């Protein structure tokens, strides 16, 4: 059924515009970079190859460093104990540069933190990259998850349902990865 204004479509019995999500439930907040529209932030922890290990959902206005502990505690697989020979590294971007609070939360869980400091140059004086940035691994995983239509636009009112869909998509990513590796053997 066509609405009264140009570009507005209505579904019988509902007053939504085309392109809007169906509901806005819990764990939704105003996005500080998108004219304060409601949005969802997905904090995700991935391994070195991009396999998702933990996912946490919050409102778009929640800072990254406040979700760090919940993300690290949400790992669903048993991880090996770090040792002197095989330490576990955790690379974080500038959003986690909040001083001793973040470093302590990371160190308590047995990780060696690598936090890019605000204002820190990426290049050494000779112009060479000492440690190449690895944030693209997380961005690639978020891109893979965004291919799932139910995750890209949030239609669920309850955050637990939305988180469940994200976890199903993560399982699908692991399945595809395992299937691809089995074909190479």
Where are these regions (language model features)?
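Helix-centered, glycine/charged polyanion-binding patches within enzymatic domains
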Residues: 80-159
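Short, conserved catalytic/metal-binding motifs centered on acidic residues
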Residues: 10-19, 44-50, 68, 87-98, ...
């Amino acid at each position: 059924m066509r609405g009264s204004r140009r570009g507005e479509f209505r579904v019988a019995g509902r007053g939504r515009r085309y392109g809007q999500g169906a509901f806005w439930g819990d764990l939704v907040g105003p996005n500080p970079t998108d004219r304060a529209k409601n949005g969802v932030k997905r904090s995700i922890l991935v391994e070195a190859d991009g396999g998702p290990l933990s996912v946490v959902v919050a409102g778009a206005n929640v800072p990254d460093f406040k979700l760090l502990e919940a993300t690290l505690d949400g790992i669903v697989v048993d991880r090996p104990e770090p040792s002197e020979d095989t330490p576990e590294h955790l690379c974080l971007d500038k959003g986690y540069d909040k001083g001793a609070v973040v470093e302590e939360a990371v160190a308590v869980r047995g990780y060696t933190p690598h936090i890019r400091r605000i204002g820190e140059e990426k290049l050494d004086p000779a112009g060479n990259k000492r440690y190449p940035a690895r944030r693209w691994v997380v961005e690639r995983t978020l891109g893979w998850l965004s291919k799932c239509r139910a995750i890209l636009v949030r239609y669920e009112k309850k955050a637990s349902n939305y988180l469940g869909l994200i976890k199903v998509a993560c399982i699908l990513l692991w399945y595809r990865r395992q299937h691809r590796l089995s074909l190479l053997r």
